């Protein structure tokens, strides 16, 4: 999925193993599918979710849930694993591939801004070298307080996938007046409950 394939302000969804294998969401133009976590987990539904997204006309992309914290070597290893699985599962080169950097489930965001940023940049470089468009995903608080987004976007351009919710609960449409004011945003996740899908 390249920026030229999905127009600005298009809707998309992200799915993981706890969602259905049928990726058919009304109004969505793309789907970002969890592929891996760490270097030994593969989403058991990823293959079917990617095929379903394609069959329903959604452009598929992928992400891996980080377990690397602030370790550059682990970030590279996790990104290499994700790139290999993205290729094997049929995510087209040029599509987005994201490093999902959050607190919990084996990952810490508390390793210091410089070290965290070094790890993220190492992962994004592996993703880019693998033929994918790199993204880093997190909530706006983590992006602003635990990473140097200035360094990241200087090297990788518009590469942030930011979660920032105006309200909790079901949201059918984005309120673009609430859009997070930060540079480098490629994708804005405005809800965790899109049209009743969560």
Region annotations inferred by a language model:
Residues 127-145:
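Aromatic-lined carbohydrate-recognition surfaces of secreted/lumenal glycan-active proteins
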Residues 1-25, 151-198:
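Functionally critical loop-and-helix segments that line ligand-binding/catalytic clefts
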Residues 106-117, 139-149, 178-196:
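Short secondary-structure transition/capping segments
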């Amino acid at each position: 999925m390249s920026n030229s394939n999905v127009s600005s302000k298009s809707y998309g969804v992200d799915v993981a193993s706890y969602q259905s294998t049928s990726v058919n969401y009304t109004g969505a133009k793309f789907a970002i599918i969890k592929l891996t976590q760490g270097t030994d987990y593969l989403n058991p539904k990823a293959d079917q979710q990617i095929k379903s997204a394609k069959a329903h006309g959604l452009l598929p992309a992928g992400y891996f849930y980080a377990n690397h914290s602030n370790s550059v070597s682990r970030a590279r290893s996790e990104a290499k694993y994700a790139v290999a699985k993205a290729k094997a599962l049929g995510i087209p080169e040029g599509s987005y591939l994201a490093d999902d950097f959050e607190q919990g489930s084996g990952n810490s965001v508390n390793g210091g801004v410089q070290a965290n940023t070094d790890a993220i940049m190492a992962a994004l470089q592996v993703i880019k070298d693998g033929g994918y468009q790199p993204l880093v995903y997190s909530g706006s608080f983590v992006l602003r307080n635990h990473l140097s987004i200035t360094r990241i976007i200087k090297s990788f351009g518009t590469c942030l996938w930011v979660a920032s919710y105006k309200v909790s609960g079901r949201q059918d449409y984005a309120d673009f007046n609430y859009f997070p004011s930060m540079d480098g945003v490629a994708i804005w996740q405005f809800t965790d409950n899109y049209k009743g899908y969560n």
